[in-house]
Amino acid sequence: MSYSGEMIREVAANAEPEPAAQPEDLGRYFLERANAGDVEGLVALYEPGAVLAFPPGRLAAGHEEIRKVYAELLADKPSFGSAGQRLAIRNGDLALTSTRLPGGGATVEVARRQPDGSWRWVIDQPAVLPCGDQGNGSRSGSPHPRRAGPAARVDDR
């Protein structure tokens, strides 16, 4: 039996996204899926009750709200990059993940090991800027028209 290219693409489009075997996989999968415009693949990186602090100053809670945020964000087909991912800090079934952004700043996330051994984010703060930075942080390191609003800041204590 032979399959047409259209059938193969349809099966691939409906395939479940690969789960993160390690917490560090989440950042890599984010970049791959965001740059591919894969909203559902991005949503799969989060637990059903996860919280995403994006755009800055707003919270999206749960898959439905996170899906809306990423559908709007990816509508303009932005390009996402990273200046390097830090090793996750683990404590049992929790992990703190972080990625440095090309334009400065960083992302900070809390991931949790799932019953099947995979990892998903439960809290995502993708726009933490260095003190004194007045821009709107993002994973791409550059402002985006839909990313207006107060930027999250690292508290200097």
Residue ranges and their predicted role:
Residues S2-I8, A106-G137:
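Short beta-strand edge/turn micro-motifs at domain boundaries
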Residues M1-P48, C131-R157:
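Short, low-complexity N-terminal intrinsically disordered segments enriched in polar/charged residues
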Residues Y46, R90-N91, Q114-P115:
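Structural motif
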Residues Y46-E47, L101, Q125:
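Short beta-strand segments enriched in hydrophobic/aromatic residues
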Residues Q22, V51, P56-R58, E64-V108, ...:
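Surface-exposed, charged secondary-structure patches
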Residues V39, A75-S79, D116:
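Generic structural signal for secondary-structure transition and capping sites
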Residues G49, P56, P115-S118:
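Residue-level recognition of short loop/turn positions
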